[in-house]
């Protein structure tokens, strides 16, 4: 567990009393945060990765339909439940990290209770939307058999969503306090359950393809349950922030603050995630759509796999920036931002080289040799250099979350992706016959524009001292 040096009484700190920051020390602190967070994020990405992989390897003449069905089902789950729930929960990225930096530990527990109230309130519409996945896909013009398979797949995924929401809230609370290791272990166990159950049910029972979705639900369900023995064995990790019994009145009091940060945070995630999922819909409308969707699904999963590493850096940036601003360490927050972006650039260069160098082999981990794999190889080689801006874009958004500037990021995401990225991708794909390659080029340029806009905002308009004062005011509400 890492520590933050903050004043004994956060109400009395003075920004000018802060010691000069040490860049080398910041690198060490961020490195300690990044490792566990990156592993946890990678493991939490695996359910979708496993679902598509298991579907693609079922020995059936309908294997291609299974891949497409799993891809569409996971797409709608992402759009309607994960992006909305996780986005709203991102309010805790700001609230808890700044409260921990300010040593206002009692606030963390109340914020957590508020999160339960808010995410609990959205469960009914989330369930309603995903229950009608088949109808939605048919309305969007997708293949009828793929829509039918996707609809059942989504229904089997629903039972795990409430458990996943509860785990996500707890994860953010623990990460804000720099508690990382137990989350890695819990995520590993959850994935083991997901893989084992999905494999057995899909390959060795009459349930078949839909056993993969049941495995995902079981894997998600065990995540918060595994926190129980952890808190029993480490009660101080619970008592530090759960300082008072459940209080609906206290939870409701902070709903406004939670939504003020959570709604823009949701829009940040939704704008980006929905833009990428829009590519899935567009790929299904291309000529030879079965091959196009298969190739696109490979790119989606490879990109998500790479993105988890950047998301780990993004979470680390969010935690460190939030802790520093909450503690009034404005001079430390700025170099922390620079260091994490430099780390991101170096990692992105490594990924670019790897994706380009192995662009011919990677798609065959998902698909058998054929037109789908060949097309995926071609698109992956074109996309690989754009991984750099995609990574910088992701981590910069983490910095903005730590500073409580979700609204600005939501606006830039909307403009970059929906005014520029998606329309450009559609234009290249359909008007200039670039197909899947055009879709991904458009989104890559959208990510570049988004990063440029956020970087300009930080360089030209931010005062780190003012951000620290705003964080202090927020923790004292």
Residue ranges of model-derived segments:
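Signature of the first transmembrane helix
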Residues: 4-14, 28-93, 263-283
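Short alpha-helical transmembrane segments in multi-pass integral membrane proteins
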Residues: 1-37, 41, 96-163, 193-263, ...
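Transmembrane helical elements of multi-pass membrane transporters/channels
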Residues: 32-52, 167, 190, 219-223, ...
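Helix-terminus/linker motif at the lipid-water interface of multi-pass membrane proteins
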Residues: 45-68, 137-144, 200-207, 266, ...
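Residue-level hotspots within pore-lining transmembrane alpha-helices
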Residues: 39-43, 47, 80, 84-85, ...
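Alpha-helical transmembrane segments of multipass membrane proteins
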Residues: 49-53, 128, 135, 169-173, ...
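Small-residue-rich hydrophobic transmembrane alpha-helices
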Residues: 52, 67-127, 131, 167-176, ...
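A late C-terminal transmembrane helix in Major Facilitator Superfamily
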Residues: 385-391, 398-425
């Amino acid at each position: 567990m890492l520590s933050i040096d903050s004043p004994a009484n956060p109400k009395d700190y003075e920004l000018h009393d802060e010691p000069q920051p040490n860049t080398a020390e910041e690198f060490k602190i961020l490195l300690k945060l990044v490792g566990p967070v990156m592993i946890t994020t990678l493991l939490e990405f695996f359910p979708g990765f496993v679902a598509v992989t298991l579907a693609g390897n079922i020995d059936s003449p309908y294997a291609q339909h299974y891949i497409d069905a799993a891809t569409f089902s996971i797409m709608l789950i992402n759009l309607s439940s994960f992006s909305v729930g996780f986005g709203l929960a991102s309010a805790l990225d700001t609230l808890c990290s700044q409260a921990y930096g300010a040593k206002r530990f009692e606030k963390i527990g109340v914020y957590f209770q508020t999160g339960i109230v808010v995410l609990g309130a959205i469960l009914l519409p989330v369930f309603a939307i995903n229950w009608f996945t088949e109808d939605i896909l048919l309305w969007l013009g997708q293949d009828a058999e793929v829509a039918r398979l996707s609809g059942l797949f989504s229904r089997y995924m629903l039972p795990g969503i409430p458990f996943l929401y509860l785990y996500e809230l707890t994860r953010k609370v623990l990460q804000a306090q720099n508690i990382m290791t137990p989350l890695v272990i819990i995520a590993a166990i959850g994935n083991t359950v997901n893989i084992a159950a999905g494999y057995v049910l899909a390959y060795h029972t009459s349930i078949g393809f839909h056993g993969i979705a049941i495995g995902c639900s079981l894997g998600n369900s065990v995540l918060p349950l595994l926190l129980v023995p952890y808190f029993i064995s480490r009660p101080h990790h619970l008592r530090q922030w759960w300082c008072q019994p459940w209080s609906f009145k206290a939870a409701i009091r902070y709903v406004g603050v939670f939504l003020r940060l959570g709604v823009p945070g949701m829009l940040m995630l939704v704008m980006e995630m929905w833009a990428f999922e829009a590519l899935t819909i567009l790929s299904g409308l291309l000529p030879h759509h079965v091959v196009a969707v298969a190739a696109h699904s490979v790119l989606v999963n490879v990109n998500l796999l790479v993105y988890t590493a950047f998301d780990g850096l993004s979470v680390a940036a969010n935690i460190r920036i939030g802790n520093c601003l909450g503690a009034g360490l404005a001079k430390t927050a700025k170099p922390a931002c620079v260091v994490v972006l430099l780390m991101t650039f170096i990692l992105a260069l490594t990924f670019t080289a790897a994706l380009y160098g192995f662009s011919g082999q990677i798609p065959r981990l998902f698909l058998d040799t054929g037109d789908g794999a060949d097309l995926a190889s071609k698109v992956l080689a074109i996309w690989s250099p754009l991984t750099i801006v995609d990574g910088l874009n992701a981590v910069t958004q983490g910095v903005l979350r730590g500073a409580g500037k979700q609204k600005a990021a939501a606006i830039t995401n909307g403009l970059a992706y929906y005014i520029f990225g998606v329309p450009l991708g559609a234009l290249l794909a359909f008007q200039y016959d670039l197909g899947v390659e055009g879709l991904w080029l458009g989104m890559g340029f959208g990510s570049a524009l988004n990063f440029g806009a956020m970087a300009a905002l930080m360089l030209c308009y931010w005062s780190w001292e003012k951000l620290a004062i705003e964080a202090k005011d927020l923790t004292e509400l």
